[in-house]
Amino acid sequence: MPQMINLGSEMLRITSRGVEYSTSSGRIWSIRYMGTSCGTFVDLLPYGSEILAVTSKGIYYSSNAGRSWSLRYMGTSCGTFQNLMDGGKELLANTDKGLYYSTNGGRTWVKRR
């Protein structure tokens, strides 16, 4: 499960303090986001012009390299999200209830049969 991603000249990672970034190939890290309103960050995924995040409160997205986050999905019918994957034409998610997919950037989810 990627807890560190590359965004061009920056790297982002999840730590116990929140989301950190590095512009020095990982030699020096600084806090990018340490708010608690999103819950605890679990996984990050670059997805088009956004970053998607699995958190303890749902799926969040950032369109400014992780400086701020907005809720994308908070439903409970899929179970607890564990990680996200870019499946090309669809977004895939492992949850404690199985594999789910989304064709609209994570706004709605359908169980893979």
Where are these regions (language model features)?
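Repeated scaffold domains used in trafficking and secretory/extracellular systems
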Residues: 1-8, 38-48, 78-88
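Hydrophobic beta-strand positions in blades of beta-propellers and related beta-sheet-rich domains
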Residues: 11, 19-20, 59-60, 99
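Short loop/turn segments immediately following the C-termini of beta-strands
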Residues: 16, 56, 96
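Conserved Ser/Thr-centered positions that define the repeating blades of beta-propeller domains
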Residues: 22-23, 62-63, 102-103
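Short coil turn/linker residues within repeat-based beta-strand modules
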Residues: 26, 66-67, 106
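Surface loop/turn motifs at the tips and blade-to-blade linkers of beta-strand repeat domains
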Residues: 33-36, 73-76
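Blade-level signature of beta-propeller repeat domains, shared across WD40, Kelch, NHL, RCC1
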Residues: 96-113
